[in-house]
Amino acid sequence: MQGVLLKMSERYFDDLKVGYQFQSELFEVTEKQIIEFAEKFDPQIFHLHRETAEQTIFKGLIASGWHTAAITMRLFVQTLNFAEGAIGLGVDELRWPNPVRPGDLLRVESEILRVRPSRSKPHHGIIRLRNTTRNQRGEVVQTMMASALVPKRK
């Protein structure tokens, strides 16, 4: 079932196959969200002040990459909706090739690259995914590889 686009309510490791693809709903990023996140977690001028940000290399306000990562996580979790939750084992190759700006609509595309039973936790399996976050113009704003521990059906 390579390239199958799945929509299900609750997923277990047993439901997942290499090549399965998932796409999230859209998420609108607002100026208020960008500034509030930056004030708490990444207080750089191009995340905090519209006027000052216009004088930077970005020529305007942009979201922190970490804010983009947090939005990606939210959309990923909502879309895959793992039964009992999934435990993140790590992220590799995290990239932010284009900035996220106020008003952008983000969507996450996830593809399962590998699946295998866990050797140490027999009631779980390990999946490897590629997550790509795009804006409304189809521009890639974040990519990453992720691994997660997912429960099997009992």
Residue positions per predicted region:
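Hot-dog-fold acyl-thioester-processing enzymes
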Residues: 2-90, 153
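HotDog/MaoC-like acyl-thioester-processing domains
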Residues: 3-18, 96, 100-154
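Conserved interaction-surface patches within small, structured recognition/assembly domains
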Residues: 92-94
